[in-house]
Amino acid sequence: DAAEPQVAVPLGDFFGTGPGVNPFRTLLQEVDARKAGDGAEMVSRWEMPYRRNARIAVANQSGSPVDMVVRYQWRDDPAAADMLTFHARWLQRDDVQTVKGAGTLDWPALRVSGGAGRFVGLQCSLYNPVTAWWGEGDEKVYVDGEPFPSTFGTGTEDYFGYAWGDPAPFASPFHAQTRCDGPGTKGNTSLLRLQTLDAIPF
């Protein structure tokens, strides 16, 4: 009965594979290009509690016909009335400029207001037009208006599960780099981090 969709994300980004079909497997997400002929099987194992009803809608904005099969599992759970609901949002920026040695640039990836919740993951796809490494920025999480971040990381590459600019795809239960074009870290890169064990409450 929500007035707006609680999940509003392009399909490839929701499944952690965008841009393109990039096979990988983590604890909660999987893309398998071998099972579906010319397409791909995309799997999400996120639990998505709802109280009265749920609706899944997929919009094809490509201009080309797409065949799709959707399978889901559900169960009655009396505890669902007390559970937090699942939300996912998508943000695109194509105007992020480098500071060319003039300091740092903080780029907000998510702002949340209105209600309690848990931050449980992030998927990041980017295009790097140069071979220079893009990921030295530290992730910072400010909770409930705090003046200094309660989470202050050591670098984007550390947040996504590797300690230097790895140019090869990889996947583990909670981290993945599903695409890295190269040479080096030039071109499209797609990363994801699941924070189910270290969720951030707000």
Across the structure, where does each feature detected by a protein language model lie?
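Beta-strand-centric surfaces of beta-sandwich/beta-rich domains
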Residues: 1-202
